[in-house]
Amino acid sequence: MSSSGTPDLPVLLTDLKIQYTKIFINNEWHDSVSGKKFPVFNPATEEELCQVEEGDKEDVDKAVKAARQAFQIGSPWRTMDASERGRLLYKLADLIERDRLLLATMESMNGGKLYSNAYLNDLAGCIKTLRYCAGWADKIQGRTIPIDGNFFTYTRHEPIGVCGQIIPWNFPLVMLIWKIGPALSCGNTVVVKPAEQTPLTALHVASLIKEAGFPPGVVNIVPGYGPTAGAAISSHMDIDKVAFTGSTEVGKLIKEAAGKSNLKRVTLELGGKSPCIVLADADLDNAVEFAHHGVFYHQGQCCIAASRIFVEESIYDEFVRRSVERAKKYILGNPLTPGVTQGPQIDKEQYDKILDLIESGKKEGAKLECGGGPWGNKGYFVQPTVFSNVTDEMRIAKEEIFGPVQQIMKFKSLDDVIKRANNTFYGLSAGVFTKDIDKAITISSALQAGTVWVNCYGVVSAQCPFGGFKMSGNGRELGEYGFHEYTEVKTVTVKISQKNS
């Protein structure tokens, strides 16, 4: 343990064996109904890691049936004490902590994530989040309401039922825990579809769910593709709620499918084009570093990426100079290799999209300060790229890039920069850097974003609600607000002979 309380980084596993590649339903492993499998790759080497059973509509139907059975009135799960649900979640957190090294290695190998980030950040976050959710299990409660007349009225916060949960590829394990933690704490059952690029850690966690003692059918995990397995979840008539993290484009399809089927509840955590506003009085070293990590963390593959940096005119040139200097320090390579500080993009589709947007920036007149192209002969690597002299109408200033590409814009007045920052379809997050508390509060109140960070960026914790305004999504995850998304409120009114205050 280091002096800061952060665990030391252990040597990663070099002989990782992938044990779980099947569909997990009713605490058992199943082959796909169709007999199909799909390949899973290492994005740093482009090598195939394994073949995973490919779930589709028939497999989702099986999983939903199991989840519905587990949710029946009188089932072991429905009659379990809330505190016991919490104990199972605490147990799952302990098992993930036990397998932390294996899961971090797997996340790095399958997702291109730096091993140090996977172990120190992602796994730590998963364990803390599960324990936070476990603590809430017996604290979700209704209230009594003094209505007029001789009646006794109270509310119950009941689990919604069977919840479909569709997980993204950029934070496979973190997002799995963000989804199942609150859902299970509230007493729901779940059908999970991990991203087809990164299903391996979810399937390992499935084995831990069984080991922890969750009843059969409470958690079901169906790997597969979005247009088949994901679509089956979104449109399923016996799923009561769907939660999705991913692109705005797919989020629209999911909400449409939910509406056309059974009007299932929907929470969406979608894309962003988050502004980061740096005022002239800001601590420049701090602002440069947070803004840098805000866009380059995990190769830029973050929904909250600070991908529009607005810098006040008087400090613009110096901010650009320091940002370029910082971006040039990366060591690219296999994220499992010690010393490497930037890994690959997830797949060729994302890699090609990023390079296309970089080319658009060059053509539209932005100044390329560094990077600007691919790196290496193997794997989906993109050079860390910084553009200055970016204007608001350029594609790189409007479209979500999801890559290691920083756009730095200039502003003169607060009114101007607030309007420009809000001039987007997105509204996930934002950053403000200033030593003036009045300006910090004024700007943060004016920004249309679900989270605003002041003199920092990307600080996410289980205790805080997370979600977007506008086309960055609906609903909130985590914090007390996140649990409301997994309950229905029922009002019960009882006629009594005499009411007494």
UniProtKB/Swiss-Prot annotation:
One of its GO terms (cellular component) is cytosol. The active site is at E269 (proton acceptor), C303 (nucleophile). Inhibited by citral, disulfiram, and cyanamide. Activated by diethylstilbestrol. Inhibited by duocarmycin analogs. Expressed by erythrocytes (at protein level). The record marks N170 as: Transition state stabilizer. The keyword RNA-binding does not apply. InterPro entries: Ald_DH/histidinol_DH, Ald_DH_C, Ald_DH_CS_CYS, Ald_DH_CS_GLU, Ald_DH_N, Aldehyde_DH_dom. GO terms for molecular function: 3-deoxyglucosone dehydrogenase activity; acetaldehyde dehydrogenase (NAD+) activity; aldehyde dehydrogenase (NAD+) activity; aminobutyraldehyde dehydrogenase (NAD+) activity; androgen binding; benzaldehyde dehydrogenase (NAD+) activity; GTPase activator activity; NAD binding. It comes from the Eukaryota. Residues 336-501 are annotated as: Mediates interaction with PRMT3. Optimum pH is 7.1-9 for the 3-deoxyglucosone dehydrogenase activity. It catalyses: an aldehyde + NAD(+) + H2O = a carboxylate + NADH + 2 H(+); all-trans-retinal + NAD(+) + H2O = all-trans-retinoate + NADH + 2 H(+); 9-cis-retinal + NAD(+) + H2O = 9-cis-retinoate + NADH + 2 H(+); 11-cis-retinal + NAD(+) + H2O = 11-cis-retinoate + NADH + 2 H(+). Its main location: cytoplasm. Keywords: Acetylation, Cell projection, Cytoplasm, Lipid metabolism, NAD, Nucleotide-binding, Oxidoreductase, Phosphoprotein. The modification Phosphothreonine is found at T337. The modification N6-acetyllysine is found at K91, K128, K252, K353, K367, K410, K419, K435, K495. It is an enzyme of class 1 (oxidoreductase). The N-terminus is blocked most probably by acetylation. The modification N-acetylserine is found at S2. It is found in: Cytoplasm, Cytosol; Cell projection, Axon. Belongs to the aldehyde dehydrogenase family. This is Aldehyde dehydrogenase 1A1. It comes from Homo sapiens (Human).
